[in-house]
């Protein structure tokens, strides 16, 4: 089956929905959203807790409520979508191959594509935990789906490895469902989640958080019977004699998220090794002109509100590209200096910036009373004071056209600088 669409969006989660709605509002009528699940909304459908929408809608919503707001806009604008449909591949000249049980094999010619595939969880195999291989070991997201959508309880006595936001939220969810969460162990000396989740999900329920600890052994024949954690040194190696044993039946893993970029790599899109997502410019455009990306497929976000904001930019940019309104120009590279893990975008052209450029980034460690500084040729063109920064919380800085006008090189450097005493 051969089809033609102006814009194809791969992924019908919060990023794909926001991008589709924005593209339609910017004059693109022929849009197709492709989603491999049986419903739109992506991961939000299993996030039944509240805390979503504070930035986007100025009110607190649950995940399904937030998704429904965007789905309603999609339906209202009559944007076409296909569910239960798998994208098999994308070519550089923007031909999408997809398959489902109704239409069969489809070849879709597009003028532009937006990648919004989200991310997946890192598994036990990826982090090589030693020990037996019994039942009762789940990723936090899988446990979340079992409990919130399928109605199955995953265990009664639980240990959680990793303090990412999903792990913290599942510590609370399991407690509310009647399980006993014995401990949360985190390999790093700081939590990987938002401070508000540590307070609301662990502190409020007296669940201990062990920083600089990891699982060193899993014991169990058919089902998990015991999990042993131990303190680690600065090289992340377990310190003998610091072991703590927990008799439990379940181990949850919240050990990081990986942007879902198998299709991106196969298409030949350049990937940033720091984010594991596509390298993008000021328009959220990848290294292949006309193919854009946004949301967790580019870099992992803390808040879905920020995913929506970023995806609207991608939707608007794709509309501009289709209408031939994108201006080419010299790229200015954004380099990371002291303390900065990555930035998005990684490069930009002055010609396409209307009012300002927003840079998203994460720091490498916890900082207090510092400045984020932007330099051009070792000259500070912008600085922002920060009382507290942590790797678990994404930072954003906005560079105005006036600031950008001070750049006199083909690169800028973003770094953390200690406050002058």
Spans of features found by a protein language model:
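FAD-site-proximal beta/loop scaffold in flavoenzymes
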Residues: 115, 137-147, 250-301
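Short, aromatic- and glycine-rich surface loops/edge beta-strands on solvent-exposed regions
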Residues: 372-374, 402-421
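Mid-to-C-terminal Rossmann-like scaffold of FAD/NAD(P)H-dependent oxidoreductases
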Residues: 305-306, 313, 317-384
């Amino acid at each position: 089956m051969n089809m033609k669409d102006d814009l194809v969006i791969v992924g019908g989660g919060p990023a794909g929905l926001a991008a589709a709605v924005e593209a339609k509002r910017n004059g693109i009528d022929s849009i197709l959203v492709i989603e491999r699940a049986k419903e739109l909304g992506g991961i939000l459908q299993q996030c039944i807790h509240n805390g979503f929408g504070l930035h986007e809608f100025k009110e607190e919503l649950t995940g399904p409520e937030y998704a429904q707001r965007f789905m309603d806009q999609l339906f209202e604008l009559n944007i076409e979508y296909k569910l239960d449909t798998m994208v098999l591949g994308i070519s550089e000249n923007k031909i999408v191959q997809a398959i489902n049980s109704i239409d069969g094999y489809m070849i879709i010619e597009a003028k532009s594509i937006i990648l919004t595939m989200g991310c997946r969880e890192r598994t036990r195999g990826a982090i090589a935990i030693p020990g037996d291989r019994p039942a009762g070991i789940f990723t936090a997201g899988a446990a979340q789906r079992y409990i919130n959508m399928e109605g199955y309880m995953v265990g009664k006595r639980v240990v959680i490895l990793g303090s990412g936001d999903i792990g913290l939220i599942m510590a609370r969810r399991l407690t509310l469902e009647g399980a006993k969460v014995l401990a949360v162990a985190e390999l790093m000396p700081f939590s990987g989640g938002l401070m508000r989740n540590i307070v609301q999900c662990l502190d409020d329920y007296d669940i201990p958080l062990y920083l600089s600890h990891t699982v060193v052994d899993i014991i169990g024949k058919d089902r998990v019977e015991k999990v042993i954690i131990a303190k680690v040194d600065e090289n992340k190696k377990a310190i003998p004699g610091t072991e703590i044993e927990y008799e439990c039946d379940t181990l949850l893993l919240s050990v990081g998220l990986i942007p879902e970029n198998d299709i991106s790599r196969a298409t030949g899109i350049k990937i940033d090794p720091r984010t594991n997502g596509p390298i993008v410019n000021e328009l959220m455009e990848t290294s292949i002109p006309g193919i854009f990306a946004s949301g967790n497929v580019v870099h992992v976000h803390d808040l879905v509100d920020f995913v929506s904001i970023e995806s609207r930019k991608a939707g608007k940019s794709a509309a501009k590209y289709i209408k031939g309104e994108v201006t080419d120009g010299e790229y200015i590279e954004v380099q990371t200096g002291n303390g900065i893990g990555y930035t998005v975008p990684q490069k930009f052209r002055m010609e396409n910036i209307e009012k300002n450029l927003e840079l998203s980034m994460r720091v490498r460690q916890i900082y207090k009373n510092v400045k984020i500084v932007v330099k051009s040729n070792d000259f500070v063109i912008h600085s922002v004071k920060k009382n507290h920064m942590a790797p678990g919380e994404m930072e954003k800085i906005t560079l105005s056209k006036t600031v950008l006008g001070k750049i006199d090189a083909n690169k800028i450097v973003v770094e953390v600088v200690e406050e002058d005493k």
